[in-house]
Amino acid sequence: MSFGQRKLDRSKPEVDFPQDPVPTELRIVDEIQGAGKEATPGATVSCHYVGVTYSGGEEFDASWNRGEPLDFTVGIGQVIQGWDQGLLGMKVGGRRRLEIPSELAYGSRGAGAVIGPDESLIFVVDLLDVR
């Protein structure tokens, strides 16, 4: 089921700044329940996302800004562990918020200038397709 068929507003989401303490385990919140095919280990998925740092709410990446979704195979380490675990069971058409502790993100090494060592991350992910 495509987003056009569902006639939902699928513009880039705003990521609300967290009020909770830094996560010590993966937190998953389905903001919109999908009704399409489910993401399973080994499936190739296509998704749009926005990523922000937990400590400051600074956006560090968004597929929406590039106009191209991200395609990857779930569960084989092509993305951070928080994504491999957090997208399992999600259905096409859904929007999911992932609050990812640093050990399931980039850990003590960080990534780039914005994601420092031991930084927890928040992603809001729209699942577009599962194949």
Positions of the model-derived regions?
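Cross-family detector of peptidyl-prolyl cis-trans isomerase
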Residues: 1-131
